Amino acid sequence: KIEVMQVSVVENEYEQRAHFEKQYPLSENVQYRFMKSCAGYCVATYVLGIGDRHPSNLMVTSDGRFLHIDFGHFLGNFKTKFGYKRETAPFVLVTQFVAVFGGEESEEFKQFENLCIEAFNVLRANFTLLCSLFTLMISSGLPELRGYDDLKWLYEKLCPEKSDEQAAEIMRELIQESLRNERTRANLFAHL
């Protein structure tokens, strides 16, 4: 069963956690599954440049899996509204999500950060494979993947020339940038 997770910019992180616990009885397994899938979501949407990230496209399963639907915009082809880029954060990560797995000072947040770093470095280690797979899809007719120039996004995001330690620091900065992004809050509010 998949449901829309209502996120309100008015609610504080404790109210959001209470809502989550009411909807999804918060066992350690559910909390851990949410945290792990949120880490996967953050890294995947960043690397693939998934756009149109708003509450109607963010879902939570009854067992705590967090997922994104609607992959119509990718490789950084983000929508604009009235000439403004709607998505300015590397990925959607708000305090309400972090509250579900314990808040920024928790061990679970450190675990989340480490999972993001590990996933990012695994993708970086497989940079050539990813580019090869995307190259095979160029002839598929996808409007946002028409030629080799479209693959620049992957190179820029995966930064294969960096060391794993440098990439870890980049991911930590991306997490903080996403968490502090006020435009994300405004975008979420606009879709309520």
Predicted feature residues:
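ATP-dependent kinase catalytic cores of phosphoinositide-metabolizing enzymes
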Residues: 1-40, 55, 59-192
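Conserved short secondary-structure elements within globular domains
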Residues: 43
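Canonical protein kinase catalytic loop motif
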Residues: 49, 54-55
